[in-house]
Every structure is written in structure tokens, then in C-alpha cells.
Amino acid sequence: MNKYDRFLTRGKPIDGSKDYAYGTLNIIEVCPSPIKIGQEDTDCNLYKITYRVPNTVADWNLPYPQKSTFVKPETVGRYTGQDDVLRNKIFEGDIVSFDDINNDRVFGIVIFNMDTLSWAIADAYKIYYDLCRASDMSIIGNKDDNKILLKNFEWNWSEYV
């Protein structure tokens, strides 16, 4: 794992692009207006991902050229440090499949388990699997692009996504 990968984050740009932006997440606090004119109070932070631009020349004494894009907060996911069988990076919010100890095919969503402070996979029955066997996993989608996959489960995924 690259030393910068532990900070790798992805998110969907607010401009409506279907592709994720990958890079370092910056959360910019925007002070809410002291006067509200009939508007709901929403998240007052802006989420921006900064990423490298290959094959360009840096300026302002930066070690490499950078660009930034604002992303939707609900699509932000952190890199887990693990790769799947095809060496794709596994991010928070990915939907994965793997064989459990009984060789049954399991589908679940990658979450950060706050009880154990570790990466885990929650399946349709709220059973948590450790992410340590990521080399046997396949990414089959993610929570943002494949909402139909989440509808097949019996319990409410909204507490995890």
C-alpha cells in the first residue's frame, strides 16, 4: 500500500458526473447565515476532494499539480487499505460478495464498525464479517450506483449508508 493510500477518499462530484473523484478529502466549514429565511438548516460543510493531475506541470511550488472538485457528502467513502481478487481498491460503501466459513455466498456492504473501530462487512441479517479476508472478495457494486442491490435485503440499510 502506498503511504498516501491511507488518506485516499472517493466521492461523486456535485456537477452530476457519474465517475468518482479520488484523492484527499478536505472538509470546509461554512458558517451558516445568522438569519434564516424559511430554509431548513442543513449540513454547513463543503466536501472537496483534491487529486493529482498526471502529465501536467506544477506551479506555486507544489510538488505535483493538483485540482479539486466538490463532492456530495453522502457519496464520500474512505479506502479500507484492502484490495479485492481483481486488485480493485475496496472503499467504504462498496457492496462485496465472498464465501463465508460454510462456503455460502455472502453479500454485504463495507462499513466502519464504530463498536470495534475496524472495517467490517454487514450482511442482510446484520451479521458483521471482518475485512481481513479481502483477497477472497469481489466488488459487485457500491451504495451510490447500485441502489437496487440494497433493496434485496430485509433490513434497513439506511443506518449504514
Language-model-detected regions and their locations in the chain:
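Secondary-structure transition motif
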Residues: M1-V161
